From Swiss-Prot:
GO cellular component: plasma membrane
Pathway given in the UniProt record: Phospholipid metabolism; phosphatidylethanolamine biosynthesis; phosphatidylethanolamine from CDP-diacylglycerol: step 2/2
Enzyme class: lyase
Recorded GO MF terms: phosphatidylserine decarboxylase activity
Residues annotated as signal peptide: none
Record-given protein name: Phosphatidylserine decarboxylase proenzyme
HAMAP family to which the protein is assigned, alphabetical: PS_decarb_PSD_B_type2
Gene: psd
Subcellular location(s) of the protein: Cell membrane
Highest classification ranks of the organism: Bacteria, Pseudomonadati, Chlamydiota, Chlamydiia, Chlamydiales
């Protein structure tokens, strides 16, 4: 697979590194040619195509892709709960569980943790989203949430985005403790959430299928937890019990092949994001984090 490099900050080392982008030549065709853009739009709006993509990744023959993928992207297989030969397909590996101690959870009731492995951008104020535009229009929180009243609650709040790359651990977790309501689904298209695509078009967040869960917490208020699906029609899977009390770090669900973004929304004066994440985000740099690390602290006046 051809690859193009993209810069990010490794949070553990503080160094700027290069992410190898999967299928960048194909993506370049889709975004830089008229024929490619037309074909891409048709394919991603076709539910049959999305189902075929998902079905292909569940075929047993795809298990032979696992070892080369692990080697190329230097995935730490020692963290996985099962050995490589136990995975029946590439999708089985994609949704793998980790050993219980593989992702320590940052302790403290006043600390919100990162919900997934991935590349993070944080926006202490929704006004900071002005650097993202959709067809020369500001990002619409109302369109994203599909609910004007809900959007109003977060309009002056804060936002964190976690982009999961294909080589990441693809189970997502609760960043705080609290009562988690039943997810609300917003149907939409299934455009790719590829980093090169996002640089050209942030619109996928308001067009793609997504699921919204409200978590009520004493420390952080009502937090909106949004999973954004992509490519594979059945990519978002919830594993928690709606209406129940959830612990910080507990598994919430997983993305099958194709789903790849988690967005957290906080009401005003509820969280202070960690300074390193804020600083790098202001420079337009994503920060690669592991699930369970500190995202921010409860706001205190």
């Amino acid at each position: 697979m051809a690859a193009r490099e993209m810069l990010y900050v490794n949070r553990e080392t503080g160094k700027v590194e290069q992410e190898r982008i999967i299928c960048s030549s194909l993506v370049k065709f889709f975004i830089e040619t008229r024929i490619g853009r037309a074909l891409y739009s048709v394919l991603c709006k076709n539910s049959l195509f999305s189902r075929i993509v998902g079905w292909c990744q569940r075929l047993r023959v795809t298990r032979y892709f696992i070892k080369p993928f692990v080697t190329k992207y230097r995935i730490c297989i020692e963290e996985s709960a099962s050995p490589l030969h136990d995975y029946a397909s590439f999708n089985d590996f994609f949704v793998r569980k980790l050993k219980p101690d593989a992702r320590p959870i940052c302790q403290g009731e006043d600390i919100c943790v990162t919900p997934a492995d991935g590349a993070y951008l944080v926006f202490p104020s929704m006004a900071d989203l002005s650097l993202f535009t959709i067809k020369n229009k500001p990002f619409s929180l109302e369109s994203f949430l599909g609910d004007p009243q809900l959007a109003h609650q977060y309009a002056q709040g804060s936002m964190a985005i976690a982009r999961l790359a294909p080589f990441d651990y693809h189970r997502f977790h609760f960043p705080i403790a609290g009562i988690a309501e039943a997810p609300r689904r917003i149907n939409g298209h299934l455009f790719s959430i590829h980093p090169l695509m996002l640089k050209r078009n942030f619109e996928v967040f308001t067009e793609n299928k997504r699921e919204i869960t409200i978590i009520t917490s004493k420390e952080f208020g009502e937090v909106a937890y949004v999973e954004v699906g992509a490519l594979n029609v059945g990519s978002i899977h919830q594993t928690f019990s709606p209406g129940s009390y959830v612990k910080k770090g507990a598994e919430k669900g997983f993305f099958a092949f194709g789903g790849s973004t988690v967005v957290l929304l906080f009401q005003p004066q509820r969280i202070i994001f960690d300074a390193d994440l804020v600083g790098y985000s202001a420079q337009g740099l994503e920060t690669r984090c592991r699930m369970g690390q500190s995202l921010g602290k409860r706001f205190s006046s």
